[in-house]
């Protein structure tokens, strides 16, 4: 061996492979206020003890590797290693365990969701000793929260910008999602806003395609916004999707939206990536733009019960990265969402402080310190008959978004918007009078339809439409 490469590795070092649990399973560990805590659903391979599986997760997502390395002696593993500090079996599931892991804060770059996820949900999800692995929840410590800007503006600032209080906001996704020319697209936006909606929306896959380039769409939508505002006296908006193939192009679109004077832009935060999303969120705060977030691709990550990452983790990450709205399921529509679990992560988005509540899937108490809240968006297969349930489930601080439930009205787009606005106002009025929307909802809608022919027509069209499938996302 060359003198230049010879080391003293043999001093206090024994090469070879040893069980992870000898170093990374520490049930006696007392978690610190500054630790990031993670709850993993672990399914070990046959023959792998749960303690070894939990320790392997802690090791591979922090300082560990498959064999002992002599450079461990050049640092303090006790300071930097992740620790599996508790393991509990999952009730009703064979060979599944919840492994709790604590990570020292020094492992993570300040203000970077990208770096946090690269460590916690990086290579470890391909680890052979595990049949499946799912990140169920994270506890983000105050010290780390304070390194993030979070939502550009938050719920209260948005209401002040829009001058709209005391009710959910109403939106509509323009359909068909692909194929319209920019001018026809702008026409649909105008009709919906003129009919009484607060927002219209680009669909998540509307970027800048040959049939409708982004600049043309932005111009026609801005015209629709200003025309409808002048005619209704209300502040209106359209979620202009700035998502693009590069961060530079994304920012070019956001800058153009600001120059047009529109109130809000949009980003697909999972397909666009957390680095791009945080960059856009910072720009939106600095330039007075609201930021609507779509979660396209989330079900690839969160749909399977035993592998991937629960949406509550993605929701927390979005609140840190930045967004004023995010799609959060409907409970009653066509998309996945069990009621208590959905309300669990809705509260994680909106509230300043959330207590641990395992009945709603919340594994840790979370304090958001001064980070603004995010408005949950209910969207997907909803119509006027759902309005009482949506108002009761989501409350005032939400956006109720009807795409087909607006544009599918037999009389056209504007009457569809009128029907939804009348239904919402009727539900809010009834609730404020003390009526129970969960019990009297259908009767409230029928009463309102007597003096709104647009609502009556909508009620007739969608009276038989239901999406009754068992939710996959259960405890």
From Swiss-Prot:
It is found in: Plastid, Chloroplast. Its main location: plastid. Residues 1-2 form a propeptide. It holds the Pfam family RuBisCO_large_N. The keyword tRNA processing does not apply. The modification N6,N6,N6-trimethyllysine is found at residue 14. It is an enzyme of class 4 (lyase). InterPro entries: RuBisCO, RuBisCo_large_chain_AS, RuBisCO_lsu_C, RuBisCO_lsu_C_sf, RuBisCO_lsu_fd_N, RuBisCO_lsu_N_sf, RuBisCO_lsuI. Substrate binds at residues 123, 173, 177, 295, 327, 379. GO terms for molecular function: magnesium ion binding; monooxygenase activity; ribulose-bisphosphate carboxylase activity. The modification N6-carboxylysine is found at residue 201. Mg(2+) binds at residues 201, 203-204. The disulfide bond which can form in the large chain dimeric partners within the hexadecamer appears to be associated with oxidative stress and protein turnover. Keywords: Acetylation, Calvin cycle, Carbon dioxide fixation, Chloroplast, Disulfide bond, Lyase, Magnesium, Metal-binding, Methylation, Monooxygenase, Oxidoreductase, Photorespiration, Photosynthesis, Plastid. Belongs to the RuBisCO large chain family. Type I subfamily. Heterohexadecamer of 8 large chains and 8 small chains; disulfide-linked. The disulfide link is formed within the large subunit homodimers. HAMAP family: RuBisCO_L_type1 (MF_01338). This is Ribulose bisphosphate carboxylase large chain. It comes from Morus indica (Mulberry). The gene is rbcL.
């Amino acid at each position: 061996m060359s003198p230049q490469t010879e080391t003293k590795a043999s001093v206090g070092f024994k090469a070879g492979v040893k069980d992870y649990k000898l170093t990374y399973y520490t049930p006696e560990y007392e978690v610190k206020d500054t630790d990031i805590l993670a709850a993993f659903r672990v399914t070990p391979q046959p023959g792998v003890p749960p303690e070894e599986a939990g320790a392997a997760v802690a090791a591979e997502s922090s300082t560990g590797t498959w064999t002992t390395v002599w450079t461990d002696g050049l640092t303090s593993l006790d300071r930097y290693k992740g620790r599996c500090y508790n393991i509990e079996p999952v009730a009703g599931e064979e060979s599944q365990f919840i492994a709790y892991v604590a990570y020292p804060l020094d492992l993570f770059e300040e203000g970077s969701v990208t770096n946090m996820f690269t460590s916690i949900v990086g290579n470890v999800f391909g680890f052979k000793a595990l049949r499946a692995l799912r990140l169920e929840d994270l506890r983000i410590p105050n010290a780390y929260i304070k390194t993030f800007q979070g939502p550009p503006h938050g719920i209260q600032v948005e209401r002040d910008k829009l001058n709209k209080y005391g009710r959910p906001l109403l939106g509509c996704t323009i359909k068909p999602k692909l194929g319209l020319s920019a001018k026809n697209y702008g026409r649909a936006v105008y009709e919906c806003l003129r009919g009484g909606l607060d927002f219209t929306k680009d669909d998540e896959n509307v970027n800048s395609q040959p049939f409708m380039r982004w600049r043309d769409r932005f111009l026609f939508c801005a015209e629709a916004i200003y025309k409808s505002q002048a005619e209704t006296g209300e502040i209106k908006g359209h979620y202009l999707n700035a998502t693009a193939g590069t961060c530079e192009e994304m920012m070019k679109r956001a800058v153009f939206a600001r120059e047009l004077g529109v109130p809000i832009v949009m980003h697909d935060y999972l397909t666009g990536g957390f680095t791009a999303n945080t960059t856009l969120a910072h720009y939106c705060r600095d330039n007075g733009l609201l930021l609507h977030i779509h979660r396209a691709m989330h079900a690839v990550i969160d749909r399977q019960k035993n592998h991937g990452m629960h949406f509550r983790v993605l929701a927390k990450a979005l609140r840190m990265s930045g967004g004023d709205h995010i799609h959060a399921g409907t409970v009653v529509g066509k998309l996945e969402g069990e009621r208590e679990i959905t309300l669990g992560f809705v509260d994680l988005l909106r509230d300043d402080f959330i207590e641990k509540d395992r009945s709603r899937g919340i594994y840790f108490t979370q304090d958001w310190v001064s980070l603004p809240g995010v408005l949950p968006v209910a969207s997907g297969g909803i119509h006027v008959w759902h309005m009482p349930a949506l108002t009761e489930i989501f409350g005032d601080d939400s956006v109720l978004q009807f795409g087909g439930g607006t544009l599918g009205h037999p009389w056209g787009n504007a009457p569809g918007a009128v029907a939804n606005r009348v239904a919402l106002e009727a539900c809010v009025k009834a609730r404020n009078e003390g009526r129970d929307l969960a019990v009297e909802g259908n009767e409230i809608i029928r009463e309102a339809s007597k003096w709104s022919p647009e609502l009556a027509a909508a009620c007739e069209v969608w009276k038989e439409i239901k999406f009754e499938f068992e939710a996959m996302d259960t405890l």
